[in-house]
A protein has these predicted regions:
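Regulatory N- and C-terminal appendages and interdomain linkers associated
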Residues: 74, 104-156
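AlphaC helix of the protein kinase catalytic domain
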Residues: 22-33
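Active-site activation/catalytic loop segments of kinase-like enzymes and analogous catalytic loops
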Residues: 84-115
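Conserved protein kinase catalytic/activation segment
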Residues: 65-77
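Conserved ATP-binding subdomain of kinase catalytic cores across diverse folds
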Residues: 1-23
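Activation of the activation-loop gatekeeper triad in protein kinase-fold domains
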Residues: 17, 77-82
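Catalytic-loop of the protein kinase fold
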Residues: 53-63, 68
């Protein structure tokens, strides 16, 4: 996570990742070697585990919200952060974060079962895996959210 320097109202000034010539690219624009992919995947999962251990879920994690610079990663964009005990859809949101991370890293050659990994991390922190999606937490315009809702309706 970039180091925060100042805060005013709903804005936080944070550390710049990059150099004078360019900002760090998002991981979504980077093709990793197999040797690079696994350690970076492990680093992302470590960060997810640390967040969860501090009662936080990123809420919108994907390769678009991870910066890549000089062989390292930095998670960014935290306005959707969720408390796992306070949000009825916390498990589904966490599962979505882990699944998106796994989708990117699978394309980079890393073997990953997003659902299994998310459940392991989730339950290791004392949370229960739930099957229900709280419809108030879904975006009707988002095809991924509609798919989640449809899948849940079929399962009933």
């Amino acid at each position: 996570v970039p180091k925060p320097y100042a805060m005013l109202k709903n804005s936080i000034m944070m550390e710049y990742i990059g150099d004078a010539g360019s900002a760090a690219p998002t991981l979504s624009t980077v093709r990793l070697t197999r040797d690079e992919a696994r350690p970076l995947f492990d680093r992302v999962i470590l960060n997810l585990n640390l967040l969860l251990g501090n009662q936080r879920i990123h809420g919108d994690l994907s390769a678009y919200n991870i910066l890549y610079w000089e062989g390292d990663i930095t998670l960014i964009d935290f306005p959707q952060v969720v408390h796992p005990e306070a949000n009825p859809s916390a498990w589904i949101i966490f599962l979505r974060d882990v699944t998106r991370v796994c989708q990117y890293f699978k394309a980079q050659g890393v073997k990953c079962d997003g659902r299994k990994l998310a459940a392991e991390l989730w339950t290791a922190h004392g949370h229960k895996v739930v099957k229900e999606v709280d419809p108030s937490q879904l975006d009707a315009e988002d095809p991924k959210d509609r798919k989640l809702w449809e899948k849940q309706k079929v399962g009933k």
